[in-house]
């Protein structure tokens, strides 16, 4: 895409993960800590757990699948209910959450740059392959709500059928952004994708000739 002159730019399209914040460091640190705690609680070597983890991540198409632990066969003892599995490994989940919150910060200069772009009258669209729930939660903590006009992402994975509390919690989280508008990308779409990029530019009222992406 041709980069227009600075004075004519009306739309900025940006990636999110590892562009606006260090997703890899956050996820790797949080996930490694969680796995270490799972090993401690279960007594099962990590090398035996990792193949199960990979299969579950592949099945759900995300390394941030929230219900990983309760689907790992090695962690479900005979006669153990899913609720009991959750309770036993809740300390591991807390390790993950604590590390994620501690590390989730914008790269230096990101907030100032987004604010400067908006002051020039330029709209900002973010496009990520991370799922909607996780991205919404991150936008709130990172301070992106209101700085970014739209964010495009896939939807969310299916919720466990035994968790009647989760649909309301997910709906609350999805509606919790005060200003930024979410739009869902079609299933299976991956980056780079020039056609999808053009679609989201047009959907947000942009002009490809006046867009930086």
Task: Describe these PLM feature segments.
Residues 2-52:
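Active-site neighborhood of HAD-like aspartate-dependent phosphohydrolases
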Residues 40, 54-98, 116:
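A metal-dependent, Asp-based hydrolase signature
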Residues 27-36, 65-73, 132, 136:
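An amphipathic alpha-helix signature
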Residues 33, 37, 112, 116, ...:
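Residue-level signal for well-ordered alpha-helical scaffold segments within enzymatic catalytic domains
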Residues 125, 131-212:
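Substrate-recognition "cap/lid" segment bordering the active-site pocket of phosphatases
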Residues 57, 98, 102, 185-189:
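Pocket-edge positions in alpha/beta enzyme catalytic cores
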Residues 7-8, 66-67, 94-140, 194:
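Short, acidic loop-to-helix structural element flanking the phosphoryl-transfer center
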């Amino acid at each position: 895409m041709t980069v227009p002159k600075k004075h004519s730019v009306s739309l900025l399209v940006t990636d999110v993960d590892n562009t606006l914040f260090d997703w890899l460091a956050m996820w790797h640190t949080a996930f490694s800590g969680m796995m270490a705690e799972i090993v401690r609680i279960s007594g099962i070597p990590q090398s035996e757990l990792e193949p199960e983890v990979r299969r579950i991540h592949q099945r759900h198409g995300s390394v941030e699948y929230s219900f990983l632990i309760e689907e790992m066969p090695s962690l479900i003892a005979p006669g153990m209910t899913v609720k009991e599995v959750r309770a036993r490994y809740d300390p591991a989940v807390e390790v993950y959450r604590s590390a994620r919150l501690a590390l989730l910060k914008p790269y230096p200069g990101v907030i100032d740059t987004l604010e400067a772009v908006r002051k020039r009258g330029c709209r900002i669209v973010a496009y990520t392959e991370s799922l909607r729930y996780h991205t919404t939660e991150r936008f709130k903590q990172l301070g992106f709500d209101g700085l970014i006009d739209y964010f495009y992402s896939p939807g969310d994975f299916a919720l466990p059928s035994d968790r009647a509390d989760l649909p309301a919690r997910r709906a609350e989280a999805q509606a919790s952004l005060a200003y930024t508008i979410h739009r869902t990308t079609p299933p299976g779409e991956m980056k780079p994708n020039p056609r999808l990029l053009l679609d989201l530019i047009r959907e947000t009222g942009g002009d490809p000739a006046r867009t930086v992406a």
